[in-house]
């Protein structure tokens, strides 16, 4: 259903943008349905998360690599009672070569053209931003002049320890905060390296409260 919606939007957008932009084409989709996303939390989940994942087929990003990282990142967020209910990777062909890079004006255009549900994760070749980050998250605090990017994560091919980087950036988005931790072993330390996996109860509370407030998380229904 979601893929059809995006495809329809792209067809409409292509007609309107034909004079100014090379058309985008949805090449394929790679769903991760609920039964392929076992919940790894020690306690019952309190909130549900859904993710739209965007990549271009002619980049380094392979679907298996992305989907494996998404599963592993979901296991890290489960310590906060957050259950990944659904994720789907949408791969595109066409468009301008610049769309494969994180660059504010071009990335704003990409989000407008693709219109993903949020939070959304974009897997790109590299960044044009200075200073340079291998991955970057956007919340309400850093998107006043670029509102299209709010609640998106951008992961470049230079990112190491991809599940950790993805979970770290998603936590920034869910908490709607750019703050880092100095606590040893914390997922929100500036460096995403093996061993930095824990989130404190306070961080979890902020992620679930802000995530629910911003419409990024849905509270679990009573069972």
What positions do the PLM features span?
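N-terminal signal peptide c-region/cleavage motif recognized by signal peptidases
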Residues: 13-14
């Amino acid at each position: 259903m979601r893929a059809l919606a995006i495809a329809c939007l792209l067809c409409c957008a292509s007609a309107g943008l034909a004079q100014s932009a090379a058309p985008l084409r949805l090449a394929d989709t790679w769903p991760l349905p609920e039964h392929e996303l076992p919940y790894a939390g020690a306690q019952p989940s309190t909130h549900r998360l859904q993710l739209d994942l965007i990549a271009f087929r002619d980049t380094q990003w392979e679907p298996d690599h992305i989907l494996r990282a998404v599963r592993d990142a979901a296991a890290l967020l489960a310590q906060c009672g957050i259950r990944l209910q659904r994720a789907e990777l949408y791969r595109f062909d066409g468009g301008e070569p610049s769309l494969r890079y994180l660059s504010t004006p071009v990335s704003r255009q990409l989000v407008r053209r693709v219109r993903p549900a949020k939070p959304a994760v974009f897997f790109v070749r590299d960044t044009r931003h200075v200073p340079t980050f291998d991955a970057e998250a956007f919340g309400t605090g850093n998107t006043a002049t670029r509102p299209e990017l709010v609640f998106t994560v951008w992961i470049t091919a230079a990112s190491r320890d991809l599940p950790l980087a993805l979970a770290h950036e998603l936590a920034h988005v869910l908490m709607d905060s750019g703050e880092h931790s100095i606590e040893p072993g914390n997922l929100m330390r500036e460096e995403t390296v093996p061993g930095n996996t824990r989130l404190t109860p306070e961080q979890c509370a902020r992620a679930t409260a802000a995530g629910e407030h911003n419409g990024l998380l849905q509270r679990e229904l009573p069972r």
